């Protein structure tokens, strides 16, 4: 997600990682405004996927927000539906590897309706493979 210093609601800092007995189970990876598909996917592969290797989840729950799309008026990331497709492909692969294919996706944000439709279509097509 985008750096919380630059967007609403101002939460999701790296140090916000849970509390009490679940401290450390929430991971936030804020990205600077203007982040491209290439940079986002590079970060995803190098920093996020290794977390799955360590955690080995029983199932994967995706909060599928598409407001990072370059055409979306809310965020200032420069992602495209192709980036969302690649992330979904990787998440599906992780679900197959660790969670016996168990993956649930819940729609969250996306406020440019055409960009949202393209992103959701890419996401669902990849989930169904």
Feature roles, as predicted:
Residues 97-103:
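A short helix->loop->beta-strand "cap" motif at the edges of active sites that frequently abuts
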Residues 53, 96-97:
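Solvent-exposed polar/charged
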Residues 80-81, 113-129:
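Short, electropositive alpha-helical surface patch
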Residues 69-72, 102, 112-116:
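Short active-site-adjacent structural elements
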Residues 84-96:
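Alpha-helix-loop-beta-strand connector modules within alpha/beta enzyme cores
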Residues 1-62, 68-76, 80-81, 89, ...:
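Conserved alpha-helical scaffold segments that buttress catalytic/binding sites
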Residues 36, 111-112:
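Glycine-/small-residue-rich active-site loops that bind phosphorylated ligands and cofactors
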């Amino acid at each position: 997600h985008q750096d919380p210093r630059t967007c609403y609601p101002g939460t999701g800092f790296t140090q916000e990682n849970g509390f009490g007995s679940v401290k450390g189970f929430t991971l936030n990876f804020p990205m600077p405004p203007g982040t491209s598909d290439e940079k986002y996917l590079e970060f995803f592969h190098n920093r996020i996927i290794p977390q799955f290797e360590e955690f080995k989840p029983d199932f994967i729950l995706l909060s599928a927000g598409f407001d990072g799309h370059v055409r979306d008026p809310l965020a200032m990331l420069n992602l495209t539906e192709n980036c969302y497709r690649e992330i979904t492909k990787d998440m599906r692969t992780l679900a197959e590897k660790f969670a016996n294919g168990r993956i649930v996706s819940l729609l969250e944000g996306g406020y440019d309706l055409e960009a949202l439709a393209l992103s959701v279509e890419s996401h669902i097509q990849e989930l169904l493979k």
